[in-house]
Each structure stands twice: as C-alpha cells, then as structure tokens.
Amino acid sequence: MKALVAAVVLALGLPALAQEAKPLEPGREVLSIPYEKYKLKNGLEVILSVDRKLPIVSVNLWYHVGAYHEAPGRTGFAHLFEHMMFQGSKNVADDVHISLLEQIGATDLNGTTNYDRTNYFETVPSNHLETALWLESDRMGFLLDALTEEKLQTQKEVVKNERRQGTETAPYGLANEKLWHALFPLPHPYHGAVIGSMKDLDAASLDDVKGFFRKWYAPANATLTIVGDFDVAKTKALVEKYFGTLPGGPKPDKPQVAPVKLTRETVIRHDETVATLPMLSLAWHSPAYLTEGDAAADVLATVLATGKASRLYKRLVLDKQIAQSVEASQESLGAQSAFTIEVVARPGVSTETLKKEVDAVLEELRKSGITQEELNRARTRYDTQMLSGLESVGGFGGKADVLQSYNHFIGEPSYLAQDLARYQAVSLEDVKRYANEMLRPDARVVLHAVPPPQAPAAPKENK
C-alpha cells in the first residue's frame, strides 16, 4: 500500500490523466476536506483548510523537487538540501530551527525527500502559527545568506553516514539498489538512489548546491498548506507578510522521460555480505500513481502478501515453510511505478526454490484471478489506512499531507472521494488483467541475493 507522500505525477501531471473513478457504493458517505486554494504574486501556491477539533495548526510545505529532477552526476542533491534546510538561515541562528519549534510545542516535525518531491512540516499550537510561518519563509527566502562551506561539508558527512547505515551496511541494502538500477537503467531519472552515491556527494560543491537551491526552491515551485484551527483572514495576512515579499521567478521545467519497457527477464546475482539468509526479489514496471491500473496493483499486492491469509504468506511461510518473510508492494511514483515481491528464505532454502513457488502463485492468479473476499479485504484495508490518517491535521497521511499529495499529483486537492472510489471500483477482472498484462515473466527483473557460503548455487546473471 502506497503512502500518500510517495510521489508526484510529473510526466502525467494533469487532472484529466488521473485514473477515472466510479461513484462510491450506494449508501457510502462522500468524504471531502474543505479547502481554499490561491496563489501569491510570486507564484507560491497556498491551500487553507479549517479544522477546529483541536487548537492546533499543521504547516506543511512541499517543494516540487526530488531525486527525479537531479542532473546526472548530481544524485542525492534533493536529500542533501533537506538536511541543509535545518542548518539556519539569515534570521535564524545555526542549528536552532528545530529547537525553536520545540520550544513552542511543535509536534510531527520533520522533512522528507523522495523521487518526486521534498516536504517540510510541523504541527504547532494555533497561537504559534506565526512563528512556524516565519521560520519556513526565512529558509525559503534567505537560506543562502547563511550557507557556508563548513555547513555543507558537515551535512555531506551526515548524509554519507546515512547511506552507509541505510544501504551499504544494511541487510540487502546494496541488493535492493542493484535491483532498482536494473529496473530503471540510465538515463532514466529514477536510476539514482534518493540518498545519492558516495561519488556524487563527495563531488558536490558549494556553488552546485547554491545553484540547485536557486532553481528548485523558488516560491513558484512550492505549495504551502495550512490545516487546523485558525482565522482565515488573519492567516492570509500572515502568509502575505512572510511569503509575499519573497522574490518570484519562473517555475522550473520538469524532466520529461519516456517510460522504461523491459523486453525480457533480467536476472541479477548479488553476493550478500550483511544478511545471512538468501533473498529473492522480483520487480516489474507498473502504472504511475492515480493512473489506470494503479489501484488494481495495490489490491493485488495486498492479496499476495498482507496478512496470514495472503497468497504468498500462506503458501511459502505457513504451508511449505520455506520462507522467513514475504512482501509485495506497488511503489506508486509520478512518472512510472514499480511492483515488487521480496521473499527471504528460511535456512537451507535456495532462491531458485523460492522463485518456482512464487511463479506458481502468480500463474494461478493469471489463470483464476482473486476471490471476492480477497478483493473486499483489500478495499477495507485501504479505506482504513486512509481514513485513520485523516484523524490528524498533520504528520504522514494527515489532512495537510492528503491535500498536498493530490494537489502535487494532479493539481486538484479535493481528490479524496475519487481516490477512495477508485479502490471500490476495482473489479475481479481488473486484478486478473493486471496480473496478466503487467506481471509477465518475460518483462521483469529477478534478483538473487545470496550469502557467500551459498553463493556458488545462485543463478548466473544474464544482464
């Protein structure tokens, strides 16, 4: 199941290209989040939504830039800049941005980067909204005034350490990166890791970083969303006060890239040096977020590997007891998505054995599809996940995030009802068609990650 913070429809960024959703089932309540959207003269988009359940306000700022937008040889810049944004600006001292927010009682305070966007968010008591807006505006408009070579070098080392811990010394970390590289080969912008490569991080100069900021961190390339208990007129005045005077500029062009198409099965072997158990990973290209087939892919991922009754878990973990764990997911991204299956073997079980069993499950799905009970369970899971997030104004999956996500993907913040409806509209035939058309054995990447003692038994690569 995708997170709402997952991606932006860049190459397909028009409302008309969103997956058409049928009406909700009769008797289902039509949900919506009331909002007002407008734009400042400098191009900054603003979305306001009042929610008076609690005296708090979520400030959520999205910049329309992620790893997808990075130039060759500049991987990791979007994520590196997420770090730099907390290091102080012209009117905010070094390393006090977070502490200033914590002093006023901020929660859900963070920044995240993925392939399609970078965001910054915090939830504050309503009477401290102005402080949060001032802090966000100061780093949007005046970060470069305080950016130094020393700060850059410090954060480069922090990010490089993150890469060591999250990729290079993490179980299957390098294996997963190798799989992704094969699924999205150069020159596709999804090829590089969000965290970047050591080589590119080492090469990043102060001038490079400043140029990245000037291009992508302009008001015209950002959306500010405020959700919670606030006075609309006063908040508009505050937004104008702190953001309206920032210089504008053109909205940067987004890369336009043709979808990648696999024409054969690509087999990759990886000698796993961190984990002690073999792992099998399979990956296919899949429809972009909110386009036709995206919801069916989510449903199928749930049927395959969510819960003890799921197809792969029941067969591989419970019945045959050859797998330690199974995962399946539709990683929905803006330009093109990825459907992945990951199985960790039990001791003594080869990845070839896992592959045969996974293929047997997939072939059964292609022939017979899923059951109505499985479809209903997947629908309920998505509804529950979505609606539970809406209980909060901020944080991951909260109202501010939801409004930002839909606005980011299709330019329309009020897509909640349609999003829920598209899952209700998925039919048994839709899922069967997806399995047959998208999860073909002749258009996928298969990775065998095997620890050294068992490595000789792993299949040879055919790259």
What are these regions (language model features)?
Residues 3-13:
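Sec-dependent N-terminal signal peptides
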Residues 11, 15-48, 231-272, 279, ...:
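Proteolytic maturation boundary segments
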Residues 20-36, 181-222, 254-259, 288, ...:
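Histidine-acidic residue clusters that define the catalytic metal-binding segment
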Residues 47-49, 54-72, 76-80, 94-142, ...:
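M16 family metallopeptidases and their MPP-like homologs
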Residues 77-85, 300:
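Active-site His/Glu-centered metal-binding helix of metallohydrolases
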Residues 87-90, 141-150, 370-371:
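Short, polar/flexible loop-turn hinges at active-site or ligand-entry regions and domain interfaces
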Residues 149, 156, 210-242, 443:
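Non-catalytic, conformational "gating/processing" segments within enzyme and secreted inhibitor domains
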Residues 164, 169, 181, 251-309, ...:
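His/Glu-based metal-binding/catalytic segments typifying zinc-dependent metallopeptidases
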